Amino acid sequence: MRAIAILLAVVATIFASLHGVSAIIAVNAEPASSIDSASTHLNFQRRLRQTGDASDEERGNTWFSAKIAKLIEQRKINAMMTKLTKGKSKDEVSKVKQAFQDNVLDELKALVEKGFAPDSFKTALEKLRPGNKGGEDLVAYFTAYWDTFHKAKKLSGVRKQKKRVPHAADV
């Protein structure tokens, strides 16, 4: 009988300790999992903040005001275009537009043939009319042309090849 009581006490102790350990693990695991989830959230927030800095709001306002200025400028251009095209048919308008584009491309080609690059064109405009604000638009337009056409020619490798003079060994 004593052996059974001792055996029962040992089993109860083992059962209680196993149940107690699992209860302790469960109690400790719950806050740990919430801490882990909170830390992943904080890491996510930290990563988001790494891309920005304190002047984000200032940049955002500048970006927005620049967009508004472009929209206002576009509306001015649209108003000017409606004045120019008022009373004309679509064919006449497209002819005027095409003639303008052809003339602009010819002028830009002539600038490149004269040896102008975007930097030299900008300095030439500044020497011609110092403090001219309208020249910035011309420089931007010429730079876009330069990047599109002139650099593309260099990248494609289209160059005038010299005629090869045959050697006596080739004949």
Swiss-Prot record:
From which residue to which does the signal peptide run? 1-23
* Entry annotated with the keyword Ion transport: no
Which UniProt key words apply to this protein? Secreted, Signal, Virulence
Record text about domains: The RxLR-dEER motif acts to carry the protein into the host cell cytoplasm through binding to cell surface phosphatidylinositol-3-phosphate.
Q: What is this protein called?
A: RxLR effector protein CRE7
Q: What does this protein do?
A: Effector that is involved in host plant infection. Contributes to virulence during the early infection stage, by inhibiting plant defense responses induced by both PAMP-triggered immunity (PTI) and effector-triggered immunity (ETI).
A Gene Ontology CC term for this entry?
Answer: extracellular region
Membership in a protein family: Belongs to the RxLR effector family.
Task: Outline the inducing conditions.
Answer: Expression is induced during host plant infection.
Source species of the chain: Phytophthora infestans (strain T30-4) (Potato late blight agent)
Localization of this protein: Secreted; Host cell
Q: Which gene encodes it?
A: CRE7
As annotated in the record, motif RxLR-dEER runs over 46-59
